[in-house]
Amino acid sequence: MAKLTKRMRVIRDKVDSTKQYDISEAVALLKELATAKFVESVDVAVNLGIDARKSDQNVRGATVLPHGTGRSVRVAVFTQGANAEAAKAAGADLVGMDDLADQIKKGEFNFDVVIASPDAMRVVGQLGQILGPRGLMPNPKVGTVTPNVAEAVKNAKAGQVRYRNDKNGIIHTTIGKVDFESDKLKENLEALLVALKKAKPTQAKGVYIKKVSLSTTMGAGVAVDQSGLSTTTA
């Protein structure tokens, strides 16, 4: 049996794996246990009551967190003409068409998000085998293929998170950094859960959001009591 590290022993002693913590208590615990030499991210895992084997029950989308993620996001935009100028004005880091595609083909990936206007998909489509495996391929379902590229750039810069369930029906994403104020992490989590509820497949039956767990980059998962969260959809 592998020997537990000092950090793992502390986590084991502090975290009750059978308990659902109030959000404030959960965040306080994460902050206490975040002892890495860098500012850890606060990640969330949401277990959904879906059958991930069925395509009509898969959940995918994007939402802007009210307090961002704490990450600096570099955005590349495939577009031209007036849209190119609008994208630059909105803060895009890279804007182009064939020239941008050539950079990517050479292995230059100086960006975290790729956005494209519909007329640019003829160029972007050639990059599917490069961008797809990296999770960077623009998709209208998450708002990264859009005629309004300026708005998409602003959303990406403002802290938009993209989500997609895995084969077990679990959503994994980030809701900020461990040095965020507790209320901001709570509001970010609530915004994500509201977005997930709005994206609920009509075919999904029974309890939809089954479990919510928070963790830091190097920490253990802490289950959150959903009754302490405001997730009513409009």
Swiss-Prot record:
Q: Does the keyword Lipid biosynthesis apply?
A: no
Q: Which cysteines are joined by disulfide bonds?
A: none
User: Per the similarity annotation, which family is this?
Assistant: Belongs to the universal ribosomal protein uL1 family.
Q: Which Pfam families match?
A: Ribosomal_L1 (PF00687)
GO-annotated molecular function: rRNA binding; structural constituent of ribosome; tRNA binding
Q: Which SUPFAM superfamilies match?
A: Ribosomal protein L1
Question: Single Gene Ontology BP term?
Answer: translation
Q: Name one GO cellular component term.
A: cytosolic large ribosomal subunit
Please explain the role this protein plays, according to its UniProt record: Binds directly to 23S rRNA. The L1 stalk is quite mobile in the ribosome, and is involved in E site tRNA release.
- Give the keywords, sorted: Repressor, Ribonucleoprotein, Ribosomal protein, RNA-binding, rRNA-binding, Translation regulation, tRNA-binding
Instruction: Name the chain's protein.
Output: Large ribosomal subunit protein uL1
